[in-house]
Amino acid sequence: MPMTMSQAFIGNFLGNSPKWYKIAILSFLIINPILFFYVSPFVAGWVLVLEFIFTLAMALKCYPLQPGGLLAIQAVAIGMTSASQVLHEIEANLEVLLLLVFMVAGIYFMKQLLLFAFTKMITKVRSKILVSLMFCLASAFLSAFLDALTVIAVIITVAVGFYSIYHKVASGKDFSADHDHTSEGKNEDGENQLNEEELESFRGFLRNLLMHAGVGTALGGVCTMVGEPQNLIIAAQANWQFGEFAIRMSPVTVPVLFAGILTCFLVEKLRWFGYGAQLPEAVHKILCDYAAYEDARRTNKDKMKLVIQAFVGVWLIAGLALHLASVGLIGLSVIILTTAFNGITDEHALGKAFEEALPFTALLAVFFAVVAVIIDQQLFGPVIQWALNHEGNTQLVIFYIANGLLSMVSDNVFVGTVYINEVKAALINGQITRDQFDLLAVAINTGTNLPSVATPNGQAAFLFLLTSALAPLIRLSYGRMVWMALPYTIVLSIVGVMAIESGFLEQMTQYFYDSHAIIHHSVKEALAPAAAH
């Protein structure tokens, strides 16, 4: 029986998403105008925010850009907010969009150097605990200067490379042969060519490293202005530069970093939560042979490319630390320098670098549309008022926990943007002092970054890993990710909240003021546009 037009419409709508999900989104689009016009704009606004969080939580069913975008377009169409308010939000956060467009693309052209470094780590260091710590620390360091998504993308590339090499050799082929590493490794008679126990151990080993690296990106990403997109939004609202941001965060981020490293050591040593998988000797030999094979084939031209990438890496770190230009422009300079000196001049080769970041950049623009609704309908007013009624440390802890809980189910860029906007409005209205605003900005930044490792919904890097082609190969499911992240979630969240609740954050911030490491800012500075930052 031929398909009817209505069946064709439902079939095409949101592609391969489950039918119940499609019906849910269509229901949202029908309910929202009714609530807005006949019940209350405030209620309709909150329902929209919850629907948007639902689309983020269901990111594995359908990329949130389409369902979230439809909700945002409708919100503007029915008058929940205006197109000019959405544009204003995007203008205020232009640096973040530039960071995603140019910085992620720039690092794409430095992948060879990063691949080289991570490959050496696995082949040269035999101790599993030491390799885990190195991956965690290397990811943390890189994420402090690069986008976490990019760091995870590189490590995924390393892991896929290793998996395919082992699969190829174990299937009886040499390094240069073509091979489908996604196959189950059976011969023509349907018998297993691969040692099942060896393969399972190797999968476990790769899972461990990827989870340590993923948490490492959160540990490093929270420390600096460019580590995560929401950090840049918070820094712009507070008018902080690179050095000041890192200093202000350090009373929370430094204890958390040490706690994270200790957790990495303990879960590996005690083999808890699925950690402690060893790299089988036979697999290690294959990987070492491959590394030697690659080193032997590396020409002077290839070596020069690595040297250029290393120099550009030094420029990147220096440019960010000294704030020589806006983050996005430094990213653009990285693209120009690496491609010019490494001879990448083909338009299609350049285009590949932008594929990773642009869908997320478009999604971020949709975030800002929902933020515009929150501002116009004053949705967070009552919640913020309740939090601001508490004094001092209690207020900071409430903001940390509120951000943390929401970041576990929703994207932390969205959560951070909403809360910093509300706190800034309270500052402008004279409800809090400028010094308290600065402390709240630290609580919001750490609250959105640290507890969000709990699920792939909160951390874009985790979601990227879960939706990658590698996840099914190494049997990394949503549930397994949440379970393996659990020890980190508990430790990072508790250490973060203790650093704030104990008064350590306030005491250290006062010490930084007294030693002139940072200065007191005025309310007038916060009113200055982000562009002046």
From Swiss-Prot:
The keyword Hydrolase does not apply. It comes from the Bacteria. Its main location: membrane. Pfam families: NhaB. GO terms for cellular component: plasma membrane. It catalyses: 2 Na(+)(in) + 3 H(+)(out) = 2 Na(+)(out) + 3 H(+)(in). GO terms for molecular function: sodium:proton antiporter activity. It is a multi-pass membrane protein. It is found in: Cell inner membrane. Keywords: Antiport, Cell inner membrane, Cell membrane, Ion transport, Membrane, Sodium, Sodium transport, Transmembrane, Transmembrane helix, Transport. The chain crosses the membrane at residues 10-30, 67-87, 96-116, 131-165, 209-229, 247-267, 310-330, 355-375, 396-416, 454-474, 481-501. Belongs to the NhaB Na(+)/H(+) (TC 2.A.34) antiporter family. Na(+)/H(+) antiporter that extrudes sodium in exchange for external protons. This is Na(+)/H(+) antiporter NhaB. It comes from Shewanella sp. (strain MR-4). The gene is nhaB.
